[in-house]
Amino acid sequence: MSLEPFQKSSALSLGVELEMQLVNTHDYDLAPYAEDMLRLMSKIALPGAVVPEMTSSMIEVSTGICHSSAEVLGQLTQIRDALVKSADKLNIAVVGGGTHPFQQWHERRIYDKPRFRELSELYGYLSKQFTIFGQHVHIGCPDADTALLTLHRMSRYIPHFIALSASSPYVQGQDTAFDSARLNSVFAFPLSGRAPFALTWDEFTVYFNKMAHTGVVKSMKDFYWDIRPKPEFGTIEIRVFDTPLTIERATALAGYVQSLGSWFMNDQPFMPTEDDYLVYTYNRFQACRFGLDAVYVDPATGGHMPLREHILMTMAQIERHAHRLDASASIHLLRTSVERNDNDARWLRERQGEERLLAEVIRQAADRFRGGVDHEPGGFS
């Protein structure tokens, strides 16, 4: 199969996908209600789409094409309210977070869809372990070469995205000591990691054709890269975010991506090189393990600095772009989070420290998702 042409899209347009947990309301374990939720959600007029995911205790929701973080928040609010309404009818709850803290992977059921059955046959138990929950952010690019240049510039900021969204400290009932343990499950797949270093669509097409010739891949869907081009949408898709506990944080992350994209496309602050990736996996590990307390190694200088300082420095650099895009509320929410050393992983650990019962933590997280408790500090009102 040949690589499809890169479609035109509006530069800096946004699309957000969220993979959500479905839990019962008696012990707050995962519950196989995807089909029922899809049936109920199909009766509600909504932007974007609601689709099944790999296992039957999760669904994916997405916005339509948006042009501002305010528009993202408006659409996610409609979708969130519909999710809550549908879940209430089924006596279940919808929860954010990158992992379910105590679910047992072997109890999961693969959703009955040909592609999911095919992946289950190929990847075995990894498919059930892939009951993890991420946020994907699409950003529109005016042409294919700009998309690749933006992709490789954005790769320097992967640790930012991981630390700011981290919400998966618990796996199988244990504190993993990682802020984002979810990504450890992604790394097990053979076509995960980072995209090849190609700065023109012609170069990328050569790479894709070579891979297709081997029979290893058939389409871009077969790549599980941290950032990948989506030629059918005219976007690049950033895939390292854990699903946040609130739609406000999900929106803020999209606003941050859009502001970075504006900085890259308008100011051309640096030219990416292959050597940027010498410290890529180290920086990614640091962010997964330590979150906002990570060390960041600057790919250009080799200098070490606290990741939180690099995030705050970057936010200052892109402030005027955020203002122009009406994304200042997004930056403010995330800046406040960094200054308070407060991400969703910390929130989950603090709740567990108080409650000593992960089921109660999930109950509170479900309430937080529906807007019931503990709103995000700063940012959106």
UniProtKB/Swiss-Prot annotation:
Keywords: ATP-binding, Ligase, Nucleotide-binding
Reactions catalysed, as given in the entry: L-cysteine + L-glutamate + ATP = gamma-L-glutamyl-L-cysteine + ADP + phosphate + H(+)
Annotated disulfide bonds: none
GO BP term (any one): modified amino acid biosynthetic process
Enzyme Commission designation: 6.3.2.2
GO molecular function: ATP binding; glutamate-cysteine ligase activity
Positions of transmembrane segments: none
Keyword ATP-binding: yes
Organism domain of life: Bacteria
InterPro entries: GCL_type2/YbdK_subfam (IPR050141), GCS2 (IPR006336), Gln_synth/guanido_kin_cat_dom (IPR014746), YbdK (IPR011793)
Pfam families xref list: GCS2 (PF04107)
Root EC class: ligase
The protein's role, per its UniProt record: ATP-dependent carboxylate-amine ligase which exhibits weak glutamate--cysteine ligase activity.
PANTHER family: GLUTAMATE--CYSTEINE LIGASE 2-RELATED
Similarity annotation: Belongs to the glutamate--cysteine ligase type 2 family. YbdK subfamily.
Protein name per UniProt: Putative glutamate--cysteine ligase 2
Organism from which the protein derives: Polaromonas naphthalenivorans (strain CJ2)
